[in-house]
Amino acid sequence: AKNIQYFGAGTRLSVL
């Protein structure tokens, strides 16, 4: 599943 989670002050982490 493609999930985009935002951490910190706008750090984009793309999860597989």
From Swiss-Prot:
It comes from the Eukaryota. It is found in: Cell membrane. Keywords: Adaptive immunity, Cell membrane, Immunity, Membrane, Receptor, T cell receptor. GO terms for cellular component: T cell receptor complex. GO terms for biological process: adaptive immune response. Coiled coil: none annotated. Its main location: membrane. Alpha-beta TR is a heterodimer composed of an alpha and beta chain; disulfide-linked. The alpha-beta TR is associated with the transmembrane signaling CD3 coreceptor proteins to form the TR-CD3 (TcR or TCR). The assembly of alpha-beta TR heterodimers with CD3 occurs in the endoplasmic reticulum where a single alpha-beta TR heterodimer associates with one CD3D-CD3E heterodimer, one CD3G-CD3E heterodimer and one CD247 homodimer forming a stable octameric structure. CD3D-CD3E and CD3G-CD3E heterodimers preferentially associate with TR alpha and TR beta chains, respectively. J region of the variable domain of T cell receptor (TR) beta chain that participates in the antigen recognition. Alpha-beta T cell receptors are antigen specific receptors which are essential to the immune response and are present on the cell surface of T lymphocytes. Recognize peptide-major histocompatibility (MH) (pMH) complexes that are displayed by antigen presenting cells (APC), a prerequisite for efficient T cell adaptive immunity against pathogens. This is T cell receptor beta joining 2-4.
